[in-house]
């Protein structure tokens, strides 16, 4: 139910995006979480678990983010790691007349000019992955199906975007919803979020 609200909320996003992958265990085998988030607003715009870390997964992840924009920004910029699947995904969208700037940062050692220019992007993706692992995934000790892994990821994204205060945002949430913020404690905020999701489902 929360997915309706997370997906359809009218986010106010910037042109600066960052993406990354991390792994989770599903039935004891490695699967891959693809994240894209707004570098400035700290809003997660794409989130999905795939059984392969391939070009199709990158394309689906980027497309999920593009759907969050009413109109694609002219200077949309996506900063990712050095995985070549993102170059192929960029080519795919270019052939569909949906161009965007792709910047690939190799590692965390600041060995190249690009690495030195975009350290905040690298730090953001590392913090997001760390938050997911420490605050969500480690308590689950893996998943027994891909469907359950993605269901849990929806809840994590709802929490991260609407309920979790961020130090870099002066303890504000990435998305401030008055109906949620007026609730006295976290359980009440979750209930309100689910109520809003139900209303979105019936709209």
Residue positions per predicted region:
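Two-metal-ion RNase H-like nuclease active-site motif
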Residues: 10-26, 35-37
């Amino acid at each position: 139910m929360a997915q309706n609200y997370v997906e359809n909320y009218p986010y106010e996003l910037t042109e600066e995006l960052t993406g990354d992958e991390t792994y989770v265990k599903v039935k004891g085998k490695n699967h891959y979480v693809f994240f894209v988030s707004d570098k400035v607003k700290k809003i997660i715009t794409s989130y999905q678990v795939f059984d392969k870390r391939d070009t199709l997964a990158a394309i689906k992840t980027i497309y999920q983010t593009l759907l969050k924009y009413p109109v694609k920004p002219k200077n949309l910029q996506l900063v990712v790691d050095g995985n070549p699947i993102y170059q192929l995904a960029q080519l795919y969208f270019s052939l569909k007349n949906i161009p965007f700037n792709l910047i690939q940062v190799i590692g965390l050692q600041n060995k190249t000019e690009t690495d030195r220019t975009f350290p905040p992007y690298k730090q953001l993706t590392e913090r997001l992955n760390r938050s997911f692992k420490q605050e969500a995934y480690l308590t689950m000790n893996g998943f027994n199906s891909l469907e359950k892994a993605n269901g849990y990821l929806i809840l994590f994204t709802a929490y991260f975007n609407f309920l979790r205060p961020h130090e870099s945002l002066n303890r504000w949430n990435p998305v401030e919803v008055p109906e949620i913020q007026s609730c006295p404690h976290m359980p009440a905020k979750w209930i309100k979020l689910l109520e809003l999701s139900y209303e979105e489902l019936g709209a």
